[in-house]
Amino acid sequence: FNVDLYMYAHQFDIRLFKKLTITALEGIFVNAPVELRYLNPFTIFHGMAPWREYPDEDDDSSYDRESHTGAYLGIKFQFTPVSNLKFYGLFAMTQFQTSYETSNYPDDTTPNAMGGQLGGRYILPVSKGRFTFALEGSYAQPYLYIKESPNWSLVRTYAENMGNKKYPFYEWIGSPFGPDTISGELNMGYEVPEKWALNFIYLFMARGEMSGTSVFDTMVGS
């Protein structure tokens, strides 16, 4: 556990025909002190290959070993075909092995790490209030957000002043459900703005063995 954890991110938005918005978001999570080079809004983080600049003292066997950094790429859209109706989606990725990498580095077992989210929301005004109907689904591959160490995996890290300090608390940066999860949520409700609201929410999740944060308990650097 240490405090030198910083998330740098920038995004580019395009709005088309007043109905469709497309967003490209890039981020880099760095286990190192603040560096001004990451604050340039026009920098392509992945093009800098910063993982090569933070050598892992415990393992220098591979030049391309990712160390002290965790990359994030997101593509989002929001589509409003008519008033009060919205559809949205997100594709997220923290690792992808190209065909060049798999063919030239056959011993590299780094898994792909991708996920997606898709949903819709409809608002029906009635009397002085409004009904809301929403449906959302998400999928995350087993190693989304997870890197070689919790110190540069995409998680927030907390520690207690009391109790057992050996195991810190982790909170995923991104989906609160974390990796290795399929989820679906149905939300229906009625509200009178600034007065009262009543909602029915049903959440279903199917979670695998990598979905919790206990995976970090056995990782180097935890």
Question: Can you describe what each PLM-predicted range is?
Answer:
Residues 1-162, 166, 179-182, 186, ...:
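Signature for the C-terminal beta-barrel architecture of outer-membrane proteins
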Residues 170-176:
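Radical SAM enzyme core and accessory elements
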Residues 184, 195-198:
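Secondary-structure boundary/capping micro-motif
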